[in-house]
Amino acid sequence: MDKENAGSSGVGGDSFILFEAECSDTDSESPAQGESTDEDLLDNATAVPGNHLELFQTQEKEAGERQISILKRKLCLSPCSADSEVEQLKSWACCHKYHTSEANPVVRRRLFERGDPGGANTPVNHEADNFSPSGLQVQSGENRWSQEKGKGGVSPVPSSAEPNMAACIQKLFKTLYIASHGEITRVFQSNKTVNHQWVILAYGVSEVLYSASFDLFGKQCNCLQTSRKVHEKGSISVYRCMFNVAKSRDTVQKLMTTILNVTAGNLLLQPPKIRGLGPALFWFKLTLSPATLTHGTTPEWIQQATNVASNTGEAAKFDLGTMVQWAYDHGFTEESKIAYEYALCAGSDCNAKAFLASTSQARLVKDCCTMVRHYLRAEVQALTMSGYIKRRCDQTAGSGSWLSIMNLLKYHGIEHIQFVNALKPWLKGIPKYNCITIVGPPNSGKSLLCNSLIAFLGGKVLTFANHHSHFWLAPLADCRVALIDDATTACWRYFDTHLRNVLDGYPFGIDRKHNTAVQMKAPPLLVTSNIDVHAEEKYFYSHSRVKPFYFKEPCPASDNGEPMFSITDADWKHFFERLWGRLDLSDQEDEVDDDECSQRTVTCSARNANDIN
Protein backbone atom coordinates (compact mmCIF):
# COMPACT_ATOMS: atom_id res chain seq x y z
CA MET A 1 0.00 0.00 0.00
CA ASP A 2 1.38 3.45 -0.87
CA LYS A 3 1.28 6.37 1.34
CA GLU A 4 -1.22 8.37 -0.53
CA ASN A 5 -3.97 5.78 -0.15
CA ALA A 6 -3.23 4.73 3.39
CA GLY A 7 -5.66 6.99 5.11
CA SER A 8 -8.55 5.95 2.88
CA SER A 9 -8.21 2.26 3.50
CA GLY A 10 -10.80 0.68 5.69
CA VAL A 11 -8.76 -2.34 6.60
CA GLY A 12 -7.28 -2.49 10.34
CA GLY A 13 -5.55 0.23 12.42
CA ASP A 14 -2.00 -1.13 12.46
CA SER A 15 -0.85 0.76 9.51
CA PHE A 16 -2.32 3.91 10.93
CA ILE A 17 -0.38 3.58 14.14
CA LEU A 18 2.89 2.93 12.37
CA PHE A 19 2.26 5.77 9.98
CA GLU A 20 1.60 8.23 12.78
CA ALA A 21 4.63 7.06 14.73
CA GLU A 22 6.89 7.71 11.84
CA CYS A 23 5.46 11.21 11.43
CA SER A 24 6.14 12.20 15.11
CA ASP A 25 8.66 14.90 16.28
CA THR A 26 12.39 14.46 16.43
CA ASP A 27 14.00 11.81 18.65
CA SER A 28 15.67 14.47 20.83
CA GLU A 29 12.46 15.04 22.77
CA SER A 30 12.28 13.33 26.13
CA PRO A 31 10.34 10.09 25.95
CA ALA A 32 8.86 10.63 29.43
CA GLN A 33 7.49 14.06 28.59
CA GLY A 34 3.92 12.93 28.35
CA GLU A 35 4.11 10.49 31.28
CA SER A 36 3.04 11.25 34.91
CA THR A 37 5.68 11.56 37.73
CA ASP A 38 3.40 11.32 40.76
CA GLU A 39 4.68 7.88 41.63
CA ASP A 40 8.21 9.30 42.47
CA LEU A 41 6.88 10.99 45.69
CA LEU A 42 6.17 7.66 47.31
CA ASP A 43 8.77 5.12 48.34
CA ASN A 44 7.41 1.83 49.59
CA ALA A 45 10.88 0.33 50.13
CA THR A 46 12.27 -0.54 53.61
CA ALA A 47 13.66 2.62 55.35
CA VAL A 48 17.43 2.57 56.09
CA PRO A 49 18.55 4.70 59.18
CA GLY A 50 20.85 7.62 58.19
CA ASN A 51 23.71 9.58 60.09
CA HIS A 52 21.89 12.86 60.65
CA LEU A 53 21.98 12.54 64.51
CA GLU A 54 25.70 11.81 64.51
CA LEU A 55 26.25 14.76 62.22
CA PHE A 56 24.30 17.01 64.58
CA GLN A 57 26.33 15.87 67.60
CA THR A 58 29.57 16.42 65.73
CA GLN A 59 28.56 19.93 64.80
CA GLU A 60 27.55 20.72 68.41
CA LYS A 61 30.85 19.36 69.71
CA GLU A 62 32.85 21.46 67.29
CA ALA A 63 30.86 24.55 68.25
CA GLY A 64 31.43 23.86 71.95
CA GLU A 65 35.16 23.42 71.47
CA ARG A 66 35.32 26.69 69.60
CA GLN A 67 33.54 28.46 72.47
CA ILE A 68 35.90 26.92 75.05
CA SER A 69 38.90 27.91 72.97
CA ILE A 70 37.65 31.50 72.82
CA LEU A 71 36.91 31.49 76.58
CA LYS A 72 40.39 30.16 77.45
CA ARG A 73 42.27 32.28 74.96
CA LYS A 74 44.20 34.02 77.75
CA LEU A 75 45.13 30.73 79.41
CA CYS A 76 45.65 28.37 76.52
CA LEU A 77 49.33 27.71 75.98
CA SER A 78 50.70 25.18 73.60
CA PRO A 79 53.64 22.96 74.54
CA CYS A 80 55.70 25.13 72.22
CA SER A 81 55.05 28.31 74.22
CA ALA A 82 57.88 30.17 75.88
CA ASP A 83 59.11 28.79 79.21
CA SER A 84 58.57 32.16 80.89
CA GLU A 85 54.84 32.02 80.13
CA VAL A 86 54.58 28.53 81.56
CA GLU A 87 56.47 29.57 84.70
CA GLN A 88 54.16 32.53 85.22
CA LEU A 89 51.15 30.25 84.91
CA LYS A 90 52.65 27.67 87.24
CA SER A 91 52.02 29.74 90.36
CA TRP A 92 48.34 30.13 89.43
CA ALA A 93 47.93 26.41 88.97
CA CYS A 94 49.59 25.63 92.32
CA CYS A 95 47.50 28.05 94.32
CA HIS A 96 44.24 27.33 92.45
CA LYS A 97 44.29 23.79 93.79
CA TYR A 98 43.12 25.04 97.22
CA HIS A 99 40.13 26.87 95.80
CA THR A 100 38.68 23.83 93.97
CA SER A 101 35.50 22.46 95.48
CA GLU A 102 36.00 19.19 97.30
CA ALA A 103 32.71 17.85 95.92
CA ASN A 104 34.05 17.86 92.38
CA PRO A 105 36.85 15.44 91.55
CA VAL A 106 40.13 17.05 90.71
CA VAL A 107 40.99 16.38 87.08
CA ARG A 108 44.35 17.46 85.74
CA ARG A 109 44.93 17.27 81.98
CA ARG A 110 47.10 18.95 79.46
CA LEU A 111 45.36 21.64 77.52
CA PHE A 112 47.02 20.49 74.31
CA GLU A 113 47.73 16.86 73.59
CA ARG A 114 49.92 15.48 70.87
CA GLY A 115 47.65 14.24 68.09
CA ASP A 116 48.74 12.76 64.81
CA PRO A 117 52.40 12.16 64.00
CA GLY A 118 52.36 15.41 62.08
CA GLY A 119 52.33 17.30 65.36
CA ALA A 120 48.84 18.83 65.14
CA ASN A 121 47.54 20.03 68.50
CA THR A 122 44.03 18.89 69.34
CA PRO A 123 42.22 20.89 72.04
CA VAL A 124 40.79 18.77 74.84
CA ASN A 125 37.52 19.74 76.46
CA HIS A 126 37.77 19.82 80.26
CA GLU A 127 36.73 21.91 83.22
CA ALA A 128 38.29 25.37 83.43
CA ASP A 129 38.69 25.15 87.21
CA ASN A 130 40.87 22.08 86.88
CA PHE A 131 43.27 23.66 84.41
CA SER A 132 46.96 22.84 84.63
CA PRO A 133 49.56 24.22 82.22
CA SER A 134 51.54 21.88 80.06
CA GLY A 135 54.80 20.78 81.52
CA LEU A 136 53.66 21.20 85.17
CA GLN A 137 53.26 18.01 87.10
CA VAL A 138 50.80 18.31 89.98
CA GLN A 139 50.94 15.58 92.58
CA SER A 140 48.93 14.82 95.67
CA GLY A 141 50.70 14.50 98.97
CA GLU A 142 53.47 16.49 100.56
CA ASN A 143 55.70 17.67 97.71
CA ARG A 144 52.84 18.75 95.49
CA TRP A 145 54.91 21.00 93.29
CA SER A 146 57.92 18.79 92.76
CA GLN A 147 59.48 18.28 89.36
CA GLU A 148 60.07 14.90 87.80
CA LYS A 149 63.82 15.32 87.83
CA GLY A 150 63.90 16.18 91.53
CA LYS A 151 64.49 13.56 94.15
CA GLY A 152 62.04 14.40 96.90
CA GLY A 153 62.90 18.12 96.98
CA VAL A 154 60.48 20.97 96.50
CA SER A 155 60.83 23.01 93.35
CA PRO A 156 61.66 26.68 93.74
CA VAL A 157 58.67 28.98 93.77
CA PRO A 158 58.91 32.13 91.64
CA SER A 159 59.15 35.40 93.48
CA SER A 160 55.83 36.53 92.03
CA ALA A 161 54.10 33.53 93.59
CA GLU A 162 55.36 34.01 97.15
CA PRO A 163 52.33 36.07 98.37
CA ASN A 164 49.96 33.45 96.98
CA MET A 165 52.06 30.70 98.48
CA ALA A 166 51.95 32.40 101.88
CA ALA A 167 48.17 32.72 101.65
CA CYS A 168 47.85 29.03 100.80
CA ILE A 169 50.02 28.04 103.78
CA GLN A 170 48.00 30.27 106.11
CA LYS A 171 44.74 28.79 104.86
CA LEU A 172 45.98 25.25 105.32
CA PHE A 173 47.24 26.15 108.81
CA LYS A 174 43.84 27.53 109.78
CA THR A 175 42.16 24.40 108.40
CA LEU A 176 44.35 22.10 110.49
CA TYR A 177 44.82 24.16 113.66
CA ILE A 178 41.56 26.18 113.69
CA ALA A 179 43.40 29.34 114.81
CA SER A 180 44.54 31.95 112.33
CA HIS A 181 48.22 32.61 111.76
CA GLY A 182 47.72 36.35 112.28
CA GLU A 183 46.15 35.77 115.70
CA ILE A 184 49.22 34.13 117.22
CA THR A 185 51.98 36.15 115.55
CA ARG A 186 52.90 39.78 115.09
CA VAL A 187 54.47 41.25 111.96
CA PHE A 188 58.12 42.20 111.51
CA GLN A 189 58.44 44.27 108.33
CA SER A 190 62.24 44.09 108.20
CA ASN A 191 64.12 40.86 107.66
CA LYS A 192 67.04 42.27 109.66
CA THR A 193 65.16 42.78 112.94
CA VAL A 194 66.45 40.35 115.54
CA ASN A 195 64.36 38.56 118.13
CA HIS A 196 64.78 35.59 120.45
CA GLN A 197 61.39 33.99 119.76
CA TRP A 198 60.08 32.94 116.33
CA VAL A 199 57.03 31.06 115.05
CA ILE A 200 57.81 29.07 111.90
CA LEU A 201 55.34 27.40 109.52
CA ALA A 202 56.93 24.92 107.12
CA TYR A 203 54.98 23.36 104.25
CA GLY A 204 55.77 19.98 102.76
CA VAL A 205 58.33 18.76 105.31
CA SER A 206 58.80 15.02 105.30
CA GLU A 207 58.23 13.10 108.50
CA VAL A 208 61.85 11.97 108.68
CA LEU A 209 63.22 15.51 108.46
CA TYR A 210 60.60 16.74 110.93
CA SER A 211 61.67 14.18 113.53
CA ALA A 212 65.34 14.96 113.00
CA SER A 213 64.79 18.73 113.17
CA PHE A 214 63.57 18.52 116.77
CA ASP A 215 66.91 17.16 117.93
CA LEU A 216 68.86 19.68 115.87
CA PHE A 217 66.87 22.68 117.06
CA GLY A 218 67.02 21.53 120.67
CA LYS A 219 70.73 22.37 120.79
CA GLN A 220 70.14 25.97 119.68
CA CYS A 221 66.98 26.80 121.63
CA ASN A 222 66.18 27.34 125.28
CA CYS A 223 62.56 26.49 124.59
CA LEU A 224 61.17 24.55 121.61
CA GLN A 225 57.68 23.37 120.72
CA THR A 226 56.92 21.54 117.47
CA SER A 227 53.81 20.03 115.91
CA ARG A 228 52.99 18.48 112.54
CA LYS A 229 49.66 17.69 110.89
CA VAL A 230 48.97 16.11 107.52
CA HIS A 231 46.12 17.01 105.17
CA GLU A 232 45.16 15.79 101.72
CA LYS A 233 46.54 19.08 100.41
CA GLY A 234 49.86 18.72 102.20
CA SER A 235 51.49 18.80 105.61
CA ILE A 236 52.14 21.75 107.93
CA SER A 237 54.93 21.73 110.52
CA VAL A 238 54.74 24.35 113.28
CA TYR A 239 57.80 25.45 115.29
CA ARG A 240 57.84 27.86 118.24
CA CYS A 241 61.49 28.49 118.98
CA MET A 242 63.22 30.56 121.65
CA PHE A 243 66.82 30.70 120.49
CA ASN A 244 69.80 31.07 122.77
CA VAL A 245 70.77 34.26 120.95
CA ALA A 246 68.62 36.73 119.04
CA LYS A 247 68.32 35.99 115.32
CA SER A 248 66.88 37.82 112.33
CA ARG A 249 64.38 36.41 109.85
CA ASP A 250 67.10 35.92 107.24
CA THR A 251 69.24 33.93 109.67
CA VAL A 252 66.37 31.70 110.79
CA GLN A 253 65.28 31.21 107.18
CA LYS A 254 68.71 29.98 106.13
CA LEU A 255 68.79 27.65 109.11
CA MET A 256 65.36 26.18 108.32
CA THR A 257 66.03 25.68 104.62
CA THR A 258 69.22 23.82 105.45
CA ILE A 259 67.73 21.51 108.06
CA LEU A 260 64.27 20.90 106.55
CA ASN A 261 65.38 20.80 102.88
CA VAL A 262 62.69 23.24 101.76
CA THR A 263 62.77 26.49 99.88
CA ALA A 264 62.19 29.93 101.36
CA GLY A 265 58.78 30.10 99.64
CA ASN A 266 57.54 27.20 101.77
CA LEU A 267 58.31 28.99 105.06
CA LEU A 268 56.46 31.62 107.08
CA LEU A 269 58.46 33.25 109.87
CA GLN A 270 57.04 35.80 112.33
CA PRO A 271 57.62 36.47 116.05
CA PRO A 272 54.87 35.29 118.41
CA LYS A 273 52.37 37.53 120.13
CA ILE A 274 53.41 37.66 123.77
CA ARG A 275 50.52 39.83 124.93
CA GLY A 276 46.98 38.60 125.13
CA LEU A 277 45.27 35.51 126.43
CA GLY A 278 44.40 33.97 123.05
CA PRO A 279 47.93 33.25 121.76
CA ALA A 280 49.04 31.89 125.13
CA LEU A 281 46.07 29.53 125.33
CA PHE A 282 46.74 28.30 121.78
CA TRP A 283 50.29 27.24 122.62
CA PHE A 284 49.25 25.86 126.00
CA LYS A 285 46.50 23.75 124.42
CA LEU A 286 48.90 22.57 121.76
CA THR A 287 51.25 21.20 124.42
CA LEU A 288 48.47 18.91 125.66
CA SER A 289 48.45 17.01 122.37
CA PRO A 290 50.50 13.78 122.38
CA ALA A 291 51.77 14.63 118.89
CA THR A 292 53.45 17.81 120.15
CA LEU A 293 57.15 17.73 121.02
CA THR A 294 58.46 20.17 123.64
CA HIS A 295 61.91 21.05 124.92
CA GLY A 296 62.89 23.37 127.77
CA THR A 297 60.68 25.39 130.10
CA THR A 298 57.53 27.20 129.10
CA PRO A 299 58.07 30.91 128.41
CA GLU A 300 57.14 33.29 131.19
CA TRP A 301 54.50 35.09 129.13
CA ILE A 302 52.61 31.83 128.61
CA GLN A 303 52.87 30.93 132.30
CA GLN A 304 51.48 34.29 133.39
CA ALA A 305 48.61 34.19 130.90
CA THR A 306 47.60 30.65 131.86
CA ASN A 307 48.11 31.08 135.60
CA VAL A 308 44.78 30.74 137.38
CA ALA A 309 45.82 32.96 140.29
CA SER A 310 46.63 35.91 138.04
CA ASN A 311 43.47 35.66 135.93
CA THR A 312 40.70 34.83 138.40
CA GLY A 313 40.80 38.16 140.24
CA GLU A 314 40.19 41.61 138.95
CA ALA A 315 42.75 43.26 136.73
CA ALA A 316 45.37 45.20 138.64
CA LYS A 317 44.80 48.94 138.71
CA PHE A 318 47.66 51.33 138.22
CA ASP A 319 48.73 53.37 141.25
CA LEU A 320 50.80 56.46 140.51
CA GLY A 321 51.97 56.69 144.13
CA THR A 322 53.59 53.25 143.89
CA MET A 323 55.48 54.32 140.79
CA VAL A 324 56.58 57.58 142.44
CA GLN A 325 57.78 55.67 145.50
CA TRP A 326 59.79 53.31 143.30
CA ALA A 327 61.42 56.19 141.40
CA TYR A 328 62.13 58.06 144.63
CA ASP A 329 63.76 55.03 146.25
CA HIS A 330 66.02 54.53 143.23
CA GLY A 331 66.77 58.23 142.78
CA PHE A 332 65.51 58.44 139.18
CA THR A 333 64.71 62.00 138.10
CA GLU A 334 64.84 61.67 134.28
CA GLU A 335 61.69 60.75 132.37
CA SER A 336 63.44 58.40 129.94
CA LYS A 337 65.20 56.58 132.78
CA ILE A 338 61.97 56.18 134.75
CA ALA A 339 60.01 54.87 131.75
CA TYR A 340 62.66 52.35 130.72
CA GLU A 341 63.52 50.99 134.16
CA TYR A 342 59.89 50.71 135.26
CA ALA A 343 58.97 48.86 132.08
CA LEU A 344 61.65 46.29 132.90
CA CYS A 345 59.91 45.60 136.21
CA ALA A 346 56.67 44.52 134.52
CA GLY A 347 57.62 40.86 134.82
CA SER A 348 57.60 40.93 138.63
CA ASP A 349 55.61 44.06 139.54
CA CYS A 350 51.84 44.13 139.00
CA ASN A 351 51.75 47.92 139.08
CA ALA A 352 54.43 48.10 136.37
CA LYS A 353 52.41 45.62 134.31
CA ALA A 354 49.35 47.84 134.68
CA PHE A 355 51.52 50.79 133.66
CA LEU A 356 52.38 49.06 130.38
CA ALA A 357 48.70 48.35 129.78
CA SER A 358 47.83 52.01 130.22
CA THR A 359 47.26 54.25 127.22
CA SER A 360 48.65 57.31 129.06
CA GLN A 361 52.18 56.17 129.74
CA ALA A 362 53.79 59.44 128.64
CA ARG A 363 51.60 61.49 130.96
CA LEU A 364 52.16 59.11 133.86
CA VAL A 365 55.93 59.22 133.40
CA LYS A 366 55.89 63.01 133.30
CA ASP A 367 53.77 63.23 136.45
CA CYS A 368 55.98 60.71 138.23
CA CYS A 369 59.15 62.60 137.32
CA THR A 370 57.64 65.89 138.48
CA MET A 371 56.60 64.47 141.83
CA VAL A 372 59.99 62.87 142.45
CA ARG A 373 61.74 66.17 141.78
CA HIS A 374 59.39 67.95 144.18
CA TYR A 375 60.10 65.42 146.92
CA LEU A 376 63.86 65.49 146.41
CA ARG A 377 64.00 69.30 146.26
CA ALA A 378 62.03 69.62 149.48
CA GLU A 379 64.12 66.95 151.14
CA VAL A 380 67.39 68.63 150.20
CA GLN A 381 66.18 72.04 151.34
CA ALA A 382 65.13 70.58 154.68
CA LEU A 383 68.67 69.35 155.40
CA THR A 384 71.51 71.43 156.77
CA MET A 385 74.82 71.44 154.93
CA SER A 386 76.27 69.09 157.53
CA GLY A 387 73.36 66.70 157.18
CA TYR A 388 73.54 66.91 153.40
CA ILE A 389 77.28 66.09 153.35
CA LYS A 390 76.70 63.23 155.78
CA ARG A 391 74.02 61.84 153.51
CA ARG A 392 76.30 62.07 150.45
CA CYS A 393 79.01 60.24 152.38
CA ASP A 394 76.58 57.46 153.29
CA GLN A 395 75.54 57.09 149.65
CA THR A 396 79.15 56.76 148.47
CA ALA A 397 80.43 53.18 148.42
CA GLY A 398 84.05 52.11 148.75
CA SER A 399 86.99 53.62 150.54
CA GLY A 400 89.50 56.19 149.38
CA SER A 401 92.29 58.38 150.68
CA TRP A 402 92.26 62.10 151.31
CA LEU A 403 95.96 62.22 150.47
CA SER A 404 95.21 62.29 146.71
CA ILE A 405 93.54 65.69 147.24
CA MET A 406 96.28 66.98 149.49
CA ASN A 407 98.99 65.88 147.06
CA LEU A 408 97.36 67.87 144.24
CA LEU A 409 97.21 70.99 146.44
CA LYS A 410 100.79 70.46 147.58
CA TYR A 411 101.94 70.06 143.97
CA HIS A 412 100.65 73.56 143.20
CA GLY A 413 102.12 75.07 146.39
CA ILE A 414 98.83 75.54 148.26
CA GLU A 415 98.91 75.09 152.03
CA HIS A 416 96.47 72.47 153.29
CA ILE A 417 95.28 74.57 156.21
CA GLN A 418 94.71 77.52 153.88
CA PHE A 419 92.42 75.50 151.62
CA VAL A 420 90.52 74.01 154.57
CA ASN A 421 90.02 77.45 156.15
CA ALA A 422 88.59 78.76 152.88
CA LEU A 423 86.35 75.71 152.49
CA LYS A 424 84.81 76.08 155.96
CA PRO A 425 82.93 79.41 155.38
CA TRP A 426 82.28 78.41 151.75
CA LEU A 427 80.22 75.41 152.87
CA LYS A 428 78.23 77.61 155.24
CA GLY A 429 77.52 80.18 152.53
CA ILE A 430 78.82 83.16 154.50
CA PRO A 431 78.64 86.37 152.44
CA LYS A 432 81.89 87.50 150.87
CA TYR A 433 83.15 83.89 151.20
CA ASN A 434 80.58 82.25 148.95
CA CYS A 435 82.78 81.98 145.82
CA ILE A 436 86.10 80.12 145.43
CA THR A 437 88.05 80.57 142.21
CA ILE A 438 90.75 78.24 140.90
CA VAL A 439 93.01 80.22 138.54
CA GLY A 440 95.77 78.80 136.39
CA PRO A 441 97.01 77.91 132.92
CA PRO A 442 95.50 75.10 130.84
CA ASN A 443 96.09 71.45 131.87
CA SER A 444 96.84 72.40 135.46
CA GLY A 445 94.12 70.25 137.09
CA LYS A 446 91.60 73.01 137.87
CA SER A 447 88.61 71.19 136.38
CA LEU A 448 89.81 67.89 137.86
CA LEU A 449 89.56 69.19 141.42
CA CYS A 450 86.34 71.18 141.03
CA ASN A 451 84.36 68.66 138.97
CA SER A 452 85.20 65.84 141.39
CA LEU A 453 84.00 67.96 144.34
CA ILE A 454 80.76 68.96 142.57
CA ALA A 455 80.10 65.33 141.57
CA PHE A 456 80.51 64.18 145.17
CA LEU A 457 78.21 66.90 146.55
CA GLY A 458 75.62 66.39 143.80
CA GLY A 459 75.85 69.96 142.53
CA LYS A 460 74.95 71.53 139.19
CA VAL A 461 77.21 72.86 136.43
CA LEU A 462 76.26 76.16 134.78
CA THR A 463 77.19 76.92 131.18
CA PHE A 464 77.71 80.58 130.39
CA ALA A 465 76.94 79.92 126.72
CA ASN A 466 73.25 79.82 127.72
CA HIS A 467 73.29 83.23 129.42
CA HIS A 468 71.10 84.74 126.69
CA SER A 469 68.25 82.60 128.02
CA HIS A 470 66.26 83.83 131.01
CA PHE A 471 66.38 80.36 132.53
CA TRP A 472 70.11 79.58 132.48
CA LEU A 473 70.32 80.03 136.28
CA ALA A 474 67.29 77.77 136.95
CA PRO A 475 69.44 74.74 138.02
CA LEU A 476 70.54 76.73 141.09
CA ALA A 477 67.07 76.23 142.57
CA ASP A 478 67.59 72.45 142.85
CA CYS A 479 71.16 72.19 144.17
CA ARG A 480 73.29 72.94 147.21
CA VAL A 481 76.51 73.84 145.33
CA ALA A 482 77.25 74.94 141.75
CA LEU A 483 80.19 75.19 139.33
CA ILE A 484 81.04 77.49 136.43
CA ASP A 485 83.86 75.86 134.50
CA ASP A 486 86.35 77.90 132.46
CA ALA A 487 84.96 81.40 132.97
CA THR A 488 86.06 83.84 130.25
CA THR A 489 86.25 87.63 130.17
CA ALA A 490 82.63 87.86 129.02
CA CYS A 491 81.54 85.69 131.94
CA TRP A 492 83.38 87.82 134.50
CA ARG A 493 81.99 90.99 132.93
CA TYR A 494 78.45 89.56 133.13
CA PHE A 495 78.87 88.59 136.80
CA ASP A 496 80.43 91.93 137.67
CA THR A 497 77.50 93.71 136.04
CA HIS A 498 74.45 91.58 136.95
CA LEU A 499 75.29 88.90 139.54
CA ARG A 500 77.38 90.47 142.28
CA ASN A 501 74.87 89.28 144.89
CA VAL A 502 75.40 85.69 143.66
CA LEU A 503 79.13 86.04 144.28
CA ASP A 504 78.35 87.48 147.70
CA GLY A 505 75.94 84.69 148.65
CA TYR A 506 72.90 86.87 149.23
CA PRO A 507 69.33 86.07 148.14
CA PHE A 508 68.50 86.67 144.49
CA GLY A 509 65.66 85.91 142.09
CA ILE A 510 65.62 83.05 139.57
CA ASP A 511 63.28 82.88 136.60
CA ARG A 512 62.17 79.30 135.97
CA LYS A 513 60.49 77.97 132.85
CA HIS A 514 56.75 77.23 133.21
CA ASN A 515 57.00 78.35 136.84
CA THR A 516 56.88 81.58 138.73
CA ALA A 517 60.15 83.28 139.65
CA VAL A 518 61.57 82.18 142.99
CA GLN A 519 63.73 84.08 145.45
CA MET A 520 66.43 82.05 147.18
CA LYS A 521 69.85 82.33 148.75
CA ALA A 522 72.70 81.82 146.32
CA PRO A 523 74.39 78.44 146.85
CA PRO A 524 78.19 78.15 147.27
CA LEU A 525 79.86 78.70 143.89
CA LEU A 526 83.05 77.26 142.38
CA VAL A 527 84.66 78.95 139.38
CA THR A 528 87.61 77.84 137.25
CA SER A 529 89.25 80.38 134.96
CA ASN A 530 92.42 81.33 133.14
CA ILE A 531 91.86 84.98 134.09
CA ASP A 532 92.99 86.39 137.42
CA VAL A 533 90.23 88.71 138.55
CA HIS A 534 92.41 90.31 141.22
CA ALA A 535 94.92 91.38 138.57
CA GLU A 536 92.26 93.28 136.62
CA GLU A 537 91.35 96.74 137.88
CA LYS A 538 88.08 96.74 135.95
CA TYR A 539 86.83 93.96 138.25
CA PHE A 540 87.69 95.92 141.37
CA TYR A 541 84.27 95.38 142.94
CA SER A 542 84.63 91.61 142.59
CA HIS A 543 87.95 91.37 144.41
CA SER A 544 86.35 91.14 147.85
CA ARG A 545 83.76 88.62 146.67
CA VAL A 546 86.12 85.99 145.23
CA LYS A 547 88.65 83.81 147.09
CA PRO A 548 91.39 82.76 144.61
CA PHE A 549 93.70 79.72 144.57
CA TYR A 550 96.41 79.52 141.94
CA PHE A 551 97.37 76.35 140.07
CA LYS A 552 100.61 77.41 138.44
CA GLU A 553 102.10 74.11 137.30
CA PRO A 554 100.80 71.90 134.47
CA CYS A 555 99.36 68.65 135.72
CA PRO A 556 101.72 65.71 134.98
CA ALA A 557 100.47 62.86 132.83
CA SER A 558 101.46 59.22 132.47
CA ASP A 559 102.78 57.56 129.32
CA ASN A 560 99.20 56.74 128.33
CA GLY A 561 98.15 60.39 128.55
CA GLU A 562 96.19 59.98 131.77
CA PRO A 563 96.73 62.50 134.61
CA MET A 564 98.92 61.39 137.46
CA PHE A 565 96.44 62.74 139.99
CA SER A 566 93.08 60.99 140.24
CA ILE A 567 90.33 62.05 142.65
CA THR A 568 87.21 59.93 143.23
CA ASP A 569 84.06 60.27 145.32
CA ALA A 570 85.55 57.89 147.87
CA ASP A 571 88.53 60.26 148.27
CA TRP A 572 86.23 63.18 149.05
CA LYS A 573 84.26 61.00 151.44
CA HIS A 574 87.44 60.25 153.38
CA PHE A 575 88.45 63.94 153.15
CA PHE A 576 85.25 65.16 154.84
CA GLU A 577 85.24 62.37 157.42
CA ARG A 578 88.87 63.15 158.29
CA LEU A 579 88.35 66.93 158.51
CA TRP A 580 84.79 66.94 159.83
CA GLY A 581 85.65 68.82 163.01
CA ARG A 582 88.09 71.25 161.38
CA LEU A 583 85.46 72.17 158.78
CA ASP A 584 83.16 73.00 161.70
CA LEU A 585 80.46 70.60 160.57
CA SER A 586 77.83 69.85 163.23
CA ASP A 587 77.40 66.52 164.96
CA GLN A 588 74.74 64.40 163.29
CA GLU A 589 73.55 62.84 166.53
CA ASP A 590 72.49 66.27 167.78
CA GLU A 591 70.67 66.97 164.52
CA VAL A 592 68.72 63.73 164.82
CA ASP A 593 67.45 64.80 168.22
CA ASP A 594 66.62 68.32 167.05
CA ASP A 595 64.92 67.41 163.76
CA GLU A 596 63.52 63.91 163.59
CA CYS A 597 61.18 64.78 160.73
CA SER A 598 64.06 65.34 158.31
CA GLN A 599 65.51 61.91 159.07
CA ARG A 600 62.45 59.74 158.64
CA THR A 601 61.73 57.83 155.44
CA VAL A 602 59.51 59.66 152.96
CA THR A 603 56.32 57.81 152.01
CA CYS A 604 55.15 58.68 148.50
CA SER A 605 52.30 56.17 148.17
CA ALA A 606 49.21 55.28 150.15
CA ARG A 607 50.55 52.16 151.83
CA ASN A 608 48.69 50.07 154.35
CA ALA A 609 49.66 50.25 157.97
CA ASN A 610 50.82 46.62 157.94
CA ASP A 611 53.05 47.01 154.87
CA ILE A 612 56.74 46.69 155.48
CA ASN A 613 58.79 49.56 154.06
Swiss-Prot record:
Q: Which InterPro entries match?
A: Helicase_SF3_DNA-vir (IPR014015), P-loop_NTPase (IPR027417), PPV_DNA_helicase_E1_C (IPR001177), PPV_DNA_helicase_E1_N (IPR014000), PPV_E1_DBD (IPR046832), PPV_E1_DBD_sf (IPR046935), Rep_E1_papillomaV (IPR016393), Znf_lg_T-Ag_D1_dom_sf (IPR037102)
- Principal location: host cell
Q: Record's Gene Ontology CC terms?
A: host cell nucleus
Give the EC number: 5.6.2.4
Catalysed reaction, written as an equation: Couples ATP hydrolysis with the unwinding of duplex DNA by translocating in the 3'-5' direction; ATP + H2O = ADP + phosphate + H(+)
Motif Nuclear localization signal: where in chain:
72-74
Q: List UniProt keywords, sorted A-Z.
A: ATP-binding, DNA replication, DNA-binding, Early protein, Helicase, Host nucleus, Hydrolase, Isomerase, Isopeptide bond, Nucleotide-binding, Phosphoprotein, Ubl conjugation
Task: For the region DNA-binding region, give the residue spans.
Answer: 148-315
Q: Where is this region: Disordered?
A: 23-43, 114-159
Localization, per the record, is: Host nucleus
The Phosphoserine modification is found at: 78
EC category: isomerase
Q: Where is this cross-link: Glycyl lysine isopeptide (Lys-Gly) (interchain with G-Cter in SUMO)?
A: 521
**Which terms does the record give in the GO molecular function aspect?**
ATP binding; ATP hydrolysis activity; DNA binding; DNA helicase activity
* Any single biological process term in GO: DNA replication
Cleavable signal peptide:
none
Q: How is it modified after translation?
A: Phosphorylated. Sumoylated.
Which residue ranges have biased composition labelled Polar residues? 131-144
Which residues does the record give as ATP binding sites? 440-447
- Show where the SF3 helicase domain sits: 400-564
The organism's superkingdom is given as Viruses
A Pfam family in this protein?
PPV_E1_C
Chain segments annotated as transmembrane: none
Paired cysteines (S-S) = none
**What is the protein's given name?**
Replication protein E1
